[in-house]
Amino acid sequence: AAKLQPKDIKGILILLHIVNVNGFKARTVSVSAEDGKNLNRVFPGDANGTYTDKLAYFIEKEIFSKIDYYIDVHNGDWFEDLTPFIYCVGNAPEETVAEAERMAQAADMPFYVKSQSGKGGAYNYAGTLGIPSVLIERGCNGMWSEEEVAASQKDVKNILRRIGMLKTRPTLAEMQMRVPKHMNHAHYVDSEKAGCWFPKKKAGQIVKAGELLGELKDYFGNVIEEFRLKEDAIILYQTISYSVPENSPLIAYGHYDICIDDMGNTHQHTHDELHKHRKEHYDDHAGIHSREMWEDMI
């Protein structure tokens, strides 16, 4: 909030700093201290429910009813390793999805994922109401850095420019950014049983089809489950804690089936070509958005 000036804003900007304040104070991370529920799993909420249900209900009624766009800024849980990326709504009216994609493409990320969920999460549910929405994912392990904060501030400002809300021209640093590519598919792997988790890869790493992602072992070292990929993919985020409860998230990964070049043309690849092409897309290098995109922003 301190980085923005009212004179530079077109329209009304509503900033929600910490929503689950009690959970933040109690260090319960993704769940509320009062009822153990994840706020990002209960939307649209319930006026007669528990604390978290009521909080979601309040946001849905008092915030979503007043906004035209929604930007959610997140990071990974304390037990998660995560590579930066951005979600946009995919289960929403066609024009809402298209506008959300435009927002996601203004972020300095290697790729964006269209979520097909229409409930539970705040931005997902906002999308079903016709509100173009994105969710920025950056940072993990319950830690933060000045660089990550600055990167998310840069993303928010550029998204605001993209939707015509921020009137300032981008600085040179804000113009130095990657062009995020659409990651067509995202998959989520859960553990069926409780045990000890031994991940073999890291978030952001490219994994070939058939490679071992990790093993779940019992307390005596016996393998309960092992997890392998059926196609080449990149690890979006994964659990890194030793302890894994039953039916809990382990890994999220994504992949392309059609690639888009810098001119916006789509093309198919063979299996080996696709692996090489994905690596080029996933490599953490800085690019610069096209002049046309910046003219659209400013």
Segment roles from a protein language model:
Residues 1-298:
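Structured catalytic-domain cores with a bias toward divalent-metal coordination
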